[in-house]
Amino acid sequence: MQQSTPYLSFRGIGKTFPGVKALTDISFDCYAGQVHALMGENGAGKSTLLKILSGNYAPTTGSVVINGQEMSFSDTTAALNAGVAIIYQELHLVPEMTVAENIYLGQLPHKGGIVNRSLLNYEAGLQIKHLGMDIDPDTPLKYLSIGQWQMVEIAKALARNAKIIAFDEPTSSLSAREIDNLFRVIRELRKEGRVILYVSHRMEEIFALSDAITVFKDGRYVKTFTDMQQVDHDALVQAMVGRDIGDIYGWQPRSYGEERLRLDAVKAPGVRTPISLAVRSGEIVGLFGLVGAGRSELMKGMFGGTQITAGQVYIDQQPIDIRKPSHAITAGMMLCPEDRKAEGIIPVHSVRDNINISARRKHVLGGCVINNGWEENNADHHIRSLNIKTPGAEQLIMNLSGGNQQKAILGRWLSEEMKVILLDEPTRGIDVGAKHEIYNVIYALAAQGVAVLFASSDLPEVLGVADRIVVMREGEIAGELLHEQADERQALSLAMPKVSQAVA
């Protein structure tokens, strides 16, 4: 039963940056002994609110009330000392220091200027035991797993007697076992009467942990769900994006042109048997398969990231010799890779540079001078047309959300003369609203005659977007399904590895 008095309240919180209104009039309550989830599209304002709570940002308007008192923190240390801790996706620890030193950093027990290591390790050991972990407090942090690092962050919060602990996308780098352990710890913290704020785009986690869910959209408060028996996936999606779940994919039948892409018995590292398939102009073909099916490996080979070891790739009936990515680009074939941060973007360069970097060679002045006028116009055009949310074209792309990074990569290829686009997990790690925008870009490309081949491990996405689904299993094609006839049972049946029958 919900308590009558909230422990944490946000009252009319607003935050404005130069040219950007990040939060507007955010008001809601959180109660002790509850996990309160914050949901919304990337850029909805969840992380900004946590940074205000933790003292990273000062609110432009409004106030934070903790246990009946209006609070204002000058920095994160002040917030932590007041019992507010944020566990970020990027953990803020010192690898060369021991577990105990990290837990009590800034308040190491000492006498006469000398650290009392015996007391330090004893106190740290108590915090570790509290979390049910078996870690030597004298171990240098660099020898621990990411999941153990996270436990050290939580122990650090408990050492400051934190009553409010917020988790910002905490499972993004964890194994299944580490996620289970994190959930166990969060449930224990809830039992102890702490306020737990939990930010994640993974709905299965939200439903597994939450006692209440607050939804944000475009920096504004939308709704708080408090009866978890009455809320489902569709209701959350509708609250986040302002439309029904049935509208998310938006597939419609369309006509196709001539064959644009053909693979003839193509093999590449990680592809077990020769792959043959064709994609027509204006057609969207989805590649579905479980982990290890060979989807990404096939695309990397097609794009020249790895070497095709057998077979031939054809574009518009012409054989293409692809030994490196520049050969594929020249032929009109582009790739949005699975790991966009490592392989798709140049993190320390601007949005403008990331959009223009491929087509730049065609627009240099006198063969050697960058055409700044063209680059500025081209970047601004794609920022507007793709609705890339950024303060400006000169913003570093690493500061954008995953969905906006992906749209910038698409803008890069839209600057080229594209015939074929390969999309490898194009919406992984992207919120629902940004996914919808990516789907619309895919449909627009198909309408322009581009052949679209996209790989995804999200089966509802493949079934919802593709005109035709090619199912891969252990490096080979297991079957094909048409959009109108395909269902999850058929696709999974084809994707599951064959089980050899033992003779009794």
Curated annotation (Swiss-Prot):
E.C. no: 7.5.2.12
Q: What class of enzyme is it?
A: translocase
Task: Give the PROSITE patterns listed for this entry.
Answer: ABC_TRANSPORTER_1 (PS00211), ABC_TRANSPORTER_2 (PS50893), ARAG (PS51268)
How is this protein situated with respect to the membrane? Peripheral membrane protein
Gene3D superfamilies reported in the protein's UniProt record: P-loop containing nucleotide triphosphate hydrolases
Pfam families, sorted? ABC_tran
**Which keywords label this protein?**
ATP-binding, Cell inner membrane, Cell membrane, Membrane, Nucleotide-binding, Repeat, Sugar transport, Translocase, Transport
Q: Which GO terms describe its cellular component?
A: plasma membrane
Summarize the subunit comment.
Answer: The complex is composed of two ATP-binding proteins (AraG), two transmembrane proteins (AraH) and a solute-binding protein (AraF).
Q: What does this protein do?
A: Part of the ABC transporter complex AraFGH involved in arabinose import. Responsible for energy coupling to the transport system.
Q: Which family does it belong to?
A: Belongs to the ABC transporter superfamily. Arabinose importer (TC 3.A.1.2.2) family.
The identity of this protein, by name, is Arabinose import ATP-binding protein AraG
Q: Which species does this protein come from?
A: Escherichia coli O6:K15:H31 (strain 536 / UPEC)
